[in-house]
Design a protein with these regions (language model features):
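Conserved N-terminal structural module of periplasmic/extracytoplasmic solute-binding proteins
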Residues: 2-122, 314, 417, 426, ...
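Extracytoplasmic/periplasmic solute-binding protein
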Residues: 158-166, 171, 195-241, 277-279
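Long, aromatic- and glycine/proline-rich binding clefts that accommodate carbohydrate-like moieties
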Residues: 357-417, 421
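Short, solvent-exposed loop/beta-turn-alpha elements that line the ligand-binding surface or hinge
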Residues: 133-147, 190, 208-209, 215, ...
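Paired acidic/hydrophobic, glycine-rich loop segments that form the ligand-binding mouth/hinge
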Residues: 111-114, 278-283, 289-290
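Glycine-centered hinge/linker elements that transmit conformational signals in sensory
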Residues: 201, 237-266, 310
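Extracytoplasmic/periplasmic substrate-recognition and gating elements
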Residues: 52, 297-364, 400
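Hinge/lid segment of periplasmic solute-binding proteins
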Residues: 117-172, 302-311
Length: 448
């Protein structure tokens, strides 16, 4: 009997020990779950995370920072009730690059991220973004033909599709109509040329002893001229370029002639705001922002203004750059399907895209949304000057994407330096082109 009792007690002690061990294990697991509640453990189950910055991508005042995203999340969670979509608030645009880099380095990159133009190349280069070719190609409910072609191209890097476009803005030529009317000059058509552009600038430019100076243009740089005359300068990425082609010579000659009209004065954007300049290239987002009553009072209030396509060079077209805010997917996400469906909702759902017209200053990337009658009403509101939607369509259709390759910002600085040196110097332009061609290509070799 004593032996039996002893065995029972031992069994109870073993069971007690197992229970204690089990409690310890469960406690440790509960701590881990609490610590990882918003991290990897939760994400593997049902949490889809979004990387987004606060404020406007277009650097204008906007009180609807998260409105479109919140509406998209609400619509998504209704359709997929098992998925919870979250994002971190309060990350300003100027801090977003650093914040995203820290997330990548810590292994906690959000499943879906909004991509700043300056970050696109580096994110694709390091493999942080997922190639979307397989997802977009196999999805029967998705077609790239719904987009403006240039907006779709904005999501590519080295020929591969790493992102979907979200909103865009083409560069347009802002026009001080008051100056043109005063000088009895008709507003140019959408297919206007460099000859017309220079002729108007020359006619309106004059100075007086009273200080009532008037200028032709500000902000028209080599990128504007190259694009307008068909120069695809960085078509090979960081590969060899040719700075000596005739179209570049024509572009430099135009810039030199425009500068000479100013008698050495550096015309600025402030001069345009004060009503003293006929033309200034700006993104369409500025047009939308300054159509609002509050900003119209603060800026451009002393004159009547409108916008046009960019003027065409002799060997080019009415071409300008298209700036596009894109969204991409983390290459390490374990929620590929869920992330893709959310990206499609932001990028290709007409209802969500329509909200860009309501709560942002860019344009929807879906062609049928931007070119709808409702879009024109939402863009113009009750203002007298109606926007020429055919002109806007032409501007987007004829737009080009900013080159994307590793080291682009440095390469662009080299061309900036070359153009400034040539325009400020007294040497023959074509001779200087040959010298700078060598310098630019030497630099490109250092980044390859």
């Amino acid at each position: 009997l004593r032996v039996i009792v002893s065995d029972i007690m031992k069994t109870k002690e073993v069971n007690r020990g197992l229970k204690v061990s089990l409690c310890i294990i469960l406690f440790i697991l509960s701590i881990l779950i609490m610590q990882l509640g918003d991290g990897s453990f939760r994400r593997t189950r049902s949490n889809l995370t979004i990387g987004v910055f606060s404020g406007s991508y277009w650097d204008v005042q906007n009180g609807n920072t998260y409105r479109i995203l919140d509406d998209a999340i609400e619509k998504y969670e209704k359709k997929y009730p098992g998925i919870h979509v979250t994002y971190e608030t309060g990350i300003v645009k100027s801090d977003y690059t650093e914040w995203l880099n820290e997330k990548i380095m810590s292994g906690s990159m959000p499943d879906v991220v909004f991509i700043l133009g300056i970050d696109f190349s580096s994110l694709a280069e390091i493999g942080a973004l997922k190639n979307l070719a397989a997802l977009s190609g196999s999805d029967k409910n998705f077609t790239k033909e719904d987009y403006f072609s240039s907006a779709w191209e904005s999501g590519k890097y080295a020929g591969k599709q790493y992102a979907l476009p979200f909103e865009c803005a083409p560069q347009l030529m802002f026009v001080n109509k008051t100056i043109l009317n005063r000088e009895k000059i008709a507003l140019p058509d959408a297919d206007w040329t460099w000859d017309e552009f220079y002729s108007i600038c020359k006619k309106v430019a004059h100075s007086s002893e009273e200080g009532n100076n008037q200028y032709g243009v500000t902000g028209y740089d080599w990128t504007c001229a190259f694009n307008a005359d068909g120069v695809d300068f960085f078509s090979n990425g960081s590969g060899k370029v040719d700075f000596t082609v005739p179209a570049i010579t024509d572009s430099l000659n135009l810039l030199e002639k425009l500068n000479e009209l100013n008698d050495g004065y550096q015309v600025s954007g402030a001069d345009f705001s004060d009503g003293n300049v006929a033309f200034q290239p700006m993104p369409f987002s500025q047009y939308r922002a300054y159509k609002s009553q509050e900003l119209r009072i603060k800026k451009y209030s002393g004159f009547e203004w409108s916008c046009l396509t960019m003027p065409a060079g002799p060997d080019g077209d009415n071409v300008s750059e298209l700036d596009t805010l894109c969204i991409g997917m983390s290459s390490s996400t374990n929620m590929e399907k869920e992330a893709w469906n959310f990206m499609k909702l932001l990028s290709a759902d007409p209802e969500i895209q329509r909200e860009i017209l309501l709560y942002s200053d860019g344009l929807p990337v879906m062609r049928n949304v931007t070119l709808s009658d409702e879009a024109q009403e939402l863009i113009e509101g009750d203002h007298e000057n109606s926007l020429n939607m055919e002109m806007l369509e032409q501007a987007i259709d004829h737009s080009v994407v900013t080159p994307r390759f590793r080291g682009y910002s440095g390469a662009k600085e080299q061309v900036d330096l070359a153009v400034r040196s040539i325009l400020d110097g007294v040497s023959n332009i074509e001779t200087e082109q040959i010298l700078w061609n060598r310098e630019i290509n030497n630099y490109l070799q250092t980044i390859n």
